[in-house]
Each structure stands twice: as C-alpha cells, then as structure tokens.
C-alpha cells in the first residue's frame, strides 16, 4: 500500500471518505478543483480511500517562509491505530524535504484528542492563538 496523490478515478471513494470521517458532503467539482490547487494524498485499500490529507502550499510574504497548510487529515474508523496516519505523514515529510517547506500548520477541533496526541508525537506544537471566523451568506 503506497501513499500517492489522489487520482480522478478515486474521487467517488474520496468523497465517501470525507463523508465518513468528517461528515461533509463534497461535490465532485469541489474535489476536482482541490486536486488542481492542492496536494491530496491518499492511502487506499482495495480501491477504497482509507486515509488522506490535503496540503496547500503557501508563503509568508513578510518572513519569506514556505509552508503547507494541512487539512482533512484523517483515517476511517475501522483502520485507526494501524499506522496509516503515520504512513501518510511520512509521505508529507518527504514532500516537505523535497519542496523545501519550512513548516506545516493545521487547525484541529478541540474535541479531536486522539488527533492531538498524534500531532504531539510528530513534534507539532500548539500555537498560542485564537481563530476567529466570520461567515457571509
């Protein structure tokens, strides 16, 4: 099982993955657009996406630091605690080195304690900040 970029043929499986792990219905168009503008890594078993992460590359214009913003990092419930998140993250680390990325940033809900434990084990630190959001209809 190899971690690789999501392919067009895997969009439906990925949509099911997002629904199962995060509870969101995502359209084929939105996934297709994300595939053009982001790196979506997936781990599949029998053509089913069981783990994934999305990386968006950006650059701090003041400090000149390149970074990945990571989102939708998860593993299907039946496949947790089997090393698949680590396998995905190992691939991310390869890309960090290859693309000379300075750091990875992610946001995680307060209730995701198991994920927070994983991040800590992989040397992420909590950034002392508060996130504000304003929605427009």
Predicted features by range, described:
Residues 72-75, 81-94, 117, 121:
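Conserved acetyl-CoA-binding loop-helix of GNAT-fold acetyltransferases
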Residues 1-2:
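Extreme N-terminal starter segment of soluble prokaryotic enzymes
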Residues 86, 110-130, 134:
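Conserved active-site alpha-helix within GNAT-family acetyltransferase domains
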Residues 76, 109:
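Residue-level recognition of the GNAT/N-acetyltransferase active site
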Residues 5-65, 71:
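Acetyl-CoA-dependent GNAT
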Residues 89, 96-108:
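Conserved GNAT acetyl-CoA-binding A-motif
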């Amino acid at each position: 099982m190899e971690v690789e970029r999501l392919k067009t043929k895997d969009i439906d499986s990925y949509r099911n993955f997002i629904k199962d792990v995060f509870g969101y219905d995502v359209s084929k168009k939105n996934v297709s657009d994300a595939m053009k503008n982001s790196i979506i890594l997936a781990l599949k078993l029998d053509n089913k996406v069981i783990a994934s992460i999305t990386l968006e590359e950006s650059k701090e214009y003041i400090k000149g630091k390149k970074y990945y913003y990571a989102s939708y990092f998860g593993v299907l419930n039946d496949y947790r605690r089997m090393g698949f998140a680590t396998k995905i993250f190992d691939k991310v680390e390869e890309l960090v080195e290859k693309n000379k990325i300075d750091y990875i940033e992610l946001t995680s809900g307060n209730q995701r304690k198991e994920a927070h434990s994983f991040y800590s084990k992989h040397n992420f630190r909590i950034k002392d900040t508060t996130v504000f959001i304003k929605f427009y209809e």
